[in-house]
Swiss-Prot record:
Active site positions, chain numbering: E27, D36
Primary location class: host cell
Entry's Gene Ontology BP terms: cell wall macromolecule catabolic process; defense response to bacterium; killing of cells of another organism; peptidoglycan catabolic process
EC number: 3.2.1.17
Source species, domain of life: Viruses
Protein name: SAR-endolysin
GO MF annotation: an example: lysozyme activity
Transmembrane segments: 7-23
Free-text function comment from the UniProt entry: Signal-arrest-release (SAR) endolysin with lysozyme activity that degrades host peptidoglycans and participates with the pinholin and spanin proteins in the sequential events which lead to programmed host cell lysis releasing the mature viral particles. Once the pinholin has permeabilized the host cell membrane, the SAR-endolysin is released into the periplasm where it breaks down the peptidoglycan layer.
A Gene Ontology cellular-component term: host cell plasma membrane
Family label: Belongs to the glycosyl hydrolase 24 family.
Description of its domains: The signal-anchor, which may also be an uncleaved signal sequence tethers the SAR-endolysin to the membrane until the latter is depolarized by the holin, resulting in the escape of SAR-endolysin from the membrane.
Length: 162
């Protein structure tokens, strides 16, 4: 394995170590399913989708396993799409962001385009565009204070080593 591959592997490993801590700080941990601000069934540290079974009480071990699984999906996608070297904390921020918005949203984002153009600060600034949710009650897009707080955490990580 080349030195460059070793460095990239170490960077990814370090980012993967940071990401669960970041997500747990942002999301907290809920062992019982709840409905988030957009009405989506959610559990553990922000897990959504088919792994969430309403009415089930999850254990810490189950939450840890789900978090690793879902971070892994985000990590593999980010690592495949980012074509340039980026700092460890920026990579952790992107894992968290992609975990939150999904791979499709990240893959088609201006943020990704800017990253691959090596415009890292501008890419980090794109996080502030992603603070909206669809409110099922008003049927409108609205700013979420919780999502803004999340983006502030992700932004701090994103720019930390620039």
């Amino acid at each position: 394995m080349s030195l460059k591959n070793n460095v990239i592997g170490a960077s990814i490993g370090a980012a993967l170590t940071l990401t669960p801590t970041l997500l747990e700080r942002i999301e907290g941990i809920e062992y019982e399913v709840y409905y988030d601000i957009a009405g989506v069934p959610t559990v553990c540290s922000g897990i959504t989708g088919p792994d969430v079974i309403p009415g089930k009480k999850y254990t810490k071990r189950e939450c840890d396993a789900l978090l690793i699984k879902h971070i892994g999906v985000a990590q593999r996608y980010v690592d495949k799409k980012v074509k340039v070297d980026i700092p460890v904390t920026m990579r952790a921020s992107l894992y968290s962001f992609t975990f939150n918005v999904g791979t499709g949203a990240f893959g088609s984002s201006t943020m990704l385009k800017l990253i691959n153009q090596r415009k890292h600060k501008e890419a980090c600034n794109q996080l502030w565009r992603w603070v909206y949710y669809y409110n099922p009650k008003t049927k409108k897009r609205e700013v979420s204070r919780g999502i803004k707080n999340r983006r502030a955490e992700e932004y701090a990580y994103c720019v930390k080593e620039l």
